[in-house]
């Protein structure tokens, strides 16, 4: 996490495209300056401006979910066009709730209401996301088979058109979308999984810490795409172990021991509040 770098480093050197773009004492950086240097743009200012844009005052409910361990009646609530963050220490129920919501989309579950199709972007793409023997185009199209069929068979043309659209839209760097998915870098593999989710009919996208270990350039591109799709009405539930990613969210639910222990608006969000909620006596 960037916070660990800022706390522990004596000196910070930022490289981009093989060149040193800034080098200074760690004390001269805050998170804003570091993210800006890594992304090559006023990244956080852009985030703040885009999220501050007016949203509809009343949006339809997309998800209402209560963790199994929750005894006080607190629900996670997400409406159309919202980006909802799930925070807290890893392994405290965030992934469990996302998987329960994903399952509830096809089978009713007590304590969970889902009103639109759901897609999941897994954090462990190797074991939970990628079809290793398939091409990039096939990996993207698997969630959209109904639209890609021509009779009983998949139309290669429709599959190629879908893949080409998302290659351009999300910036998947490859000379040929028919190449095997493992020909891509890790960041581009993750982009392909986002393309799979966003190219489908899903109006609810569950993100299970999908940007862990991904380079900052890819992260910033995905952040832009998530905000763009949210502005069009898609709902995102975003679990992340990286506090700075929560700047993209409208509301943040903090988890501890399988329960929601805090609900913060984005303008209330600080790393200190998340830490206090994660370690405090609220649960």
For each of these PLM feature ranges, what is it?
Residues 1-283:
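Glycine-rich phosphate-binding loops of nucleotide-dependent enzymes
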């Amino acid at each position: 996490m960037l916070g660990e770098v800022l706390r522990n480093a004596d000196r910070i050197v930022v490289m981009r495209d093989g060149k040193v773009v800034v080098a200074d004492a760690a004390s001269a950086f805050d998170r804003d300056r570091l993210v800006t240097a890594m992304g090559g743009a006023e990244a956080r200012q852009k985030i703040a401006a885009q999220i501050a844009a007016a949203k509809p005052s009343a949006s339809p409910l997309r998800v209402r979910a209560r963790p199994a361990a929750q005894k006080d009646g607190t629900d996670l609530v997400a409406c159309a066009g919202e980006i909802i963050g799930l925070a807290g220490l890893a392994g405290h129920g965030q992934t469990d709730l996302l998987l329960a919501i994903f399952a509830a989309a096809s089978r009713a579950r007590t304590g969970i209401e889902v009103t639109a199709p759901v897609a999941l972007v897994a954090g462990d793409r190797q074991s939970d996301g990628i079809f290793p023997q398939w091409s990039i185009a096939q990996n993207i199209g698997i969630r959209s088979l109904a639209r890609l069929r021509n009779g009983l068979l998949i139309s290669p043309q429709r599959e190629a058109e879908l893949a080409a659209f998302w290659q351009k839209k999300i910036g998947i760097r490859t000379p040929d979308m028919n190449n095997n998915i493992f020909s891509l870098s890790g960041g581009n593999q993750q982009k392909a999984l986002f393309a799979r989710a966003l190219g489908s009919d899903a109006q609810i996208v569950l993100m299970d810490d999908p940007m862990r270990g991904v380079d900052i350039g890819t992260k910033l591109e995905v952040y832009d795409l998530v905000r763009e799709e949210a502005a069009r009405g898609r709902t995102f539930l975003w679990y992340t172990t990286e506090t700075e990613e929560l700047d993209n969210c409208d509301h943040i639910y903090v988890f501890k021991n399988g329960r929601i222990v805090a609900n913060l608006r984005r303008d209330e969000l600080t790393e200190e509040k998340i830490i206090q909620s994660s370690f405090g006596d609220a649960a």
